[in-house]
């Protein structure tokens, strides 16, 4: 190994320590046909990073359980926390090509461009949150590639990999689609692996350039927290029809509607349709009570309730949508959210968890986030519960006087 390569390895290690100090999450993607050198390059990088703050993630062809979740779900779940580095051996690009080549969920998508749009918005949201996404595409000449394959065949410990090579996306289809991605996206760095040490040097030089850019960008940023609501609103929530149902009618209806909800739950399961119910509203508006009545007749094996409070330390080290993406339902199941991602433009804004720039772009990000799931057939129903100030005060006083409800009172 040359002295120059050792120098580059040390520099990348130093820069990665600085990105960790600054809380910059790094995602390094390696794509390329089988036996192109992806394993050698990705492992070379992995071994020169701090093992405590780095992770290696290999994308395999989707199995039946994977298909019960949203297309990008596993990548949301495994996002690096701020300051850490993820290495992706094959990535969401290979995942997309698996779907397209094998016509996975063809009846649902019709046009697989919808998944390309999901990838674009996924990356855009992450980049806006200072995630650095570094993409490598590895090329190799046929002679060198055949040499790699022969070495793999000759080793009893790795012979199984050759069979795996034959089970991946056909080489021509993969290359054609990847070249389309590369031609449209300047973030891709193409590396020829024909000469090993030269390939390592090119990888490290590109990493150094991108890490230095990421560090400079974050060091120059200023965080401005301003959660004040300055807009005036010409409409009122109370202009809506708030007609009440009398108690007798309610008691007759609730039993019938709860039974109907149970039937809908089983119909959703049979048709593999995921359902998300989102409840937002003022304090004491009745979110918990509404959720209780919805679930009274449901089969508890098919739903979960997620009570959302202030983000934890671990959640603050991830993209703000990460904690919600992890809880989205698989096919046929129901997830109920008592407060939700809309907190980004509500309580997180007011309490200072989000800077002005972050909450201002959140509305578009939330729309794209929801679309990722509705594109796949997920039903998302959102309810906002409101009440006037007099009724709210009355309920607060009732809580103060009820020992079983005093825990609900907060500052």
Residue positions per predicted region:
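Glycine-rich phosphate-binding loop of ATP-dependent small-molecule kinases
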Residues: 1-411
């Amino acid at each position: 190994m040359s002295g120059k390569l050792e120098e580059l390895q040390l520099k990348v290690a130093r820069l990665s320590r600085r990105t960790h100090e600054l809380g910059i999450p790094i995602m390094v993607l390696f794509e390329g046909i089988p036996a192109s050198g992806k394993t050698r390059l990705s492992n070379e990088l992995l071994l020169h990073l701090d093992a405590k703050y780095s992770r290696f993630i290999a994308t395999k062809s989707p199995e039946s359980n994977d298909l019960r979740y949203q297309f990008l779900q596993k990548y949301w779940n495994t996002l690096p926390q701020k300051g850490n580095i993820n290495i992706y051996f094959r990535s969401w690009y290979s995942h997309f090509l698996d779907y397209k080549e094998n016509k996975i969920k063809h009846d649902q998508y019709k046009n697989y461009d919808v998944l390309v749009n999901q990838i674009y918005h996924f990356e855009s949201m992450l980049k806006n949150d200072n995630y650095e996404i570094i993409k490598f595409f590895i090329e190799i000449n046929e002679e060198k590639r055949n040499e790699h394959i022969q070495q793999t065949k000759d080793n009893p410990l790795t012979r199984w990999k050759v069979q795996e090579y034959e089970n991946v996306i056909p080489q021509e289809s993969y290359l054609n689609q990847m070249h389309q991605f590369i031609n449209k996206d300047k973030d891709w760095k193409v590396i020829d692996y024909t000469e090993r040490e030269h390939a390592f040097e090119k990888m490290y030089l590109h990493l150094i350039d991108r890490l230095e850019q990421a560090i400079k960008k974050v060091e120059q940023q200023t965080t401005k927290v301003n959660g004040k609501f300055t807009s005036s609103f010409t409409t009122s929530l109370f202009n809506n029809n708030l007609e009440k149902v009398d108690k007798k009618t309610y008691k007759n209806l609730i039993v019938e509607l709860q039974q109907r909800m149970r039937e809908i739950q089983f119909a959703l399961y049979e048709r593999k349709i995921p359902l998300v119910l989102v409840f937002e509203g003022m304090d004491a508006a009745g979110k918990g009570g509404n959720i209780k009545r919805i679930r009274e007749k449901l089969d508890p094996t098919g739903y979960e309730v997620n009570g959302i409070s202030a983000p934890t330390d671990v959640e603050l080290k991830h993209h703000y949508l990460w904690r919600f993406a992890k809880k989205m339902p698989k096919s046929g199941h129901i997830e109920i959210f008592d407060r939700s991602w809309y907190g980004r433009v509500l309580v997180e804004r007011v309490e200072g968890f989000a800077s002005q720039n972050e909450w201002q772009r959140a509305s578009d990000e939330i729309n794209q986030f929801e679309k990722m799931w509705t594109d796949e057939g997920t039903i998302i129903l959102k309810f906002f519960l409101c009440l006037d100030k007099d009724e709210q005060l009355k309920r607060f006083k009732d809580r103060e006087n009820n020992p079983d409800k005093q825990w609900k009172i907060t500052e």
